[in-house]
């Protein structure tokens, strides 16, 4: 295996072992059509006889609304988007389990003015309708188990924040409890409280011992529900930071008994690396099982608004929901969608280095192309770190394809900045893998009918800028 431009690449294989989780989709409802990413079988051949190949990496699905304004997306559309983005949730949630949903409800006010945030689609906190849709899906899969919604707001009390943002039984049926971390982790500074679990982490990078809420730590499934936003502390905040910073018990790690803010538990200076090491450690002590990102609005220069004016001007109007079982993969795609190099994000680097997760070659994005969604999110203090992406085009691509029975033979040449290749036949996924500058891929496709078929080759650089070519064979 060779390393080119920060990407792992390998020569094309005669018998690919990777496969898809599902075909790129166009959405469940006409109300949220998603741009086609692959050609349809316009010749009318029997494309349904072709089977998807297998993909053993991580899949991140993006559902994109076609509404011009995020504020116009309805509750019904939001549920359809969540169902599309979390279509593989059934592989994680089973009946009889204890499931914890952890939305980001950081606070309900603008720091500088004290004014209240919008209750819906504000970009800072997770819209209650997103969490409601997740709760509904979980209950369908898990009617007999326990489902809790849990949060520890930075500026509390969390109970008031939940009530303001409609996180109550009146708005969300089916939850067994709405748990506020400062209420459900024992008394102030009681590290031996029965509601708390002490976790030893011998390989911890910052500390060797961490404390968790017992229900969270012992849950069968933890689903992180962050918003899509940038923050000077970690550049991009996503599914991992949402639990690593949002779930440490406020009564243990908070500033004071009446202040659950966890700013004192760890340095938030990205330059000294403490925050990244804390995020890494806390996540490794209790990884999440699924991530669903509320990107309906998106927000730059977070984690909260800087002023009354920027409460509105820093909204990004993204109109997306993202989901996946691999939090490192989801956060990597979040960084690329918001215009930041994932290799400049400290906690993601630590996770890649220590777990081998998050390599683009092993991530498949369904639903919408990253480079077509990308917007340039700013952060408050760029001097603290992070590399913002510049506008770029996909790698160069020349390709030819031929057929011998059920076997396709594809020759291609691409630029040295190419990182990965995907191949579709009649719109059905067949291959994903690393890329070499001058390669050949042979695919055996049982059921490939007689007649003309469309083969699409897509190559990406490590920022998921793409170039595609369609060939009739």
Question: What is the predicted function of each stretch?
Answer:
Residues 1-3:
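N-terminal export leaders
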Residues 7-13, 18-412, 416-420, 425-433, ...:
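N-terminal and secondary-structure boundary signal
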Residues 444-452:
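Surface-exposed, short loops/turns at beta-strand junctions within beta-sandwich domains
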Residues 466-473:
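Edge beta-strands of extracellular beta-sandwich domains
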């Amino acid at each position: 295996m060779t390393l080119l431009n920060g990407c792992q690449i390998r020569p094309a294989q005669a018998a690919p072992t990777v496969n898809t989780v599902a075909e790129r989709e166009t959405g469940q409802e006409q109300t949220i059509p998603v741009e086609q990413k692959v050609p349809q079988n316009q010749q009318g051949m029997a494309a349904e006889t072709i089977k998807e190949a297998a993909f053993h990496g991580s899949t991140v699905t993006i559902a994109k609304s076609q509404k011009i304004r995020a504020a116009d997306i309805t509750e019904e559309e939001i549920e359809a988007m969540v169902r599309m983005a979390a279509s593989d949730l059934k592989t994680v949630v089973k009946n009889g389990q204890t499931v914890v949903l952890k939305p980001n409800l950081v606070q309900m006010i603008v720091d500088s003015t004290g004014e209240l945030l919008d209750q819906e689609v504000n970009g800072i906190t997770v819209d209650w309708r997103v969490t409601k849709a997740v709760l509904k899906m979980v209950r369908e899969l898990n009617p007999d188990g326990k489902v809790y919604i849990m949060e520890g707001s930075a500026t509390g009390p969390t109970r008031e924040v939940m009530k303001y943002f409609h996180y109550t039984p009146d708005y969300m049926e089916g939850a067994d409890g709405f748990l506020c971390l400062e209420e459900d982790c024992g008394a102030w500074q009681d590290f031996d409280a029965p509601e708390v679990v002490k976790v030893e982490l011998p390989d911890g990078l910052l500390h060797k011992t961490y404390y968790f809420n017992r229900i969270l730590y012992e849950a069968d499934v933890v689903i992180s529900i962050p918003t899509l936003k940038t923050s000077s502390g970690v550049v991009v905040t996503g599914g991992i930071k949402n639990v690593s910073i949002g779930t440490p018990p406020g009564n243990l790690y908070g500033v004071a008994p009446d202040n659950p803010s966890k700013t004192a538990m760890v340095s938030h200076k990205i330059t000294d690396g403490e925050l990244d090491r804390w995020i890494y450690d806390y996540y490794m002590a209790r990884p999440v099982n699924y991530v669903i990102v509320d990107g309906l609005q998106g927000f730059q220069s977070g984690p909260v608004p800087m002023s009354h004016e920027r409460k509105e001007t820093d909204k990004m109007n993204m109109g997306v929901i993202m989901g996946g079982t691999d939090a490192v993969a989801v956060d990597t795609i979040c960084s690329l969608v918001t215009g930041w190099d994932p290799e400049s994000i400290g906690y993601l680097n630590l996770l890649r280095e220590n777990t081998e997760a998050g390599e683009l070659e092993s991530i498949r994005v369904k639903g919408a192309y990253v480079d077509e969604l990308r917007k340039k999110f700013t952060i408050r203090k760029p001097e603290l770190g992070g590399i913002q992406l510049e506008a770029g085009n996909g790698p160069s691509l020349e390709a030819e394809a031929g057929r011998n029975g059920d076997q396709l033979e594809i020759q291609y040449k691409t630029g040295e900045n190419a990182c990965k290749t995907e191949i579709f036949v009649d719109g059905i996924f067949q291959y994903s893998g690393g890329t070499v500058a001058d390669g050949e891929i042979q695919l055996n496709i049982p059921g490939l009918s007689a007649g003309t078929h469309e083969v699409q080759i897509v190559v990406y650089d490590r920022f998921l800028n793409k170039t595609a070519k369609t060939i009739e064979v």
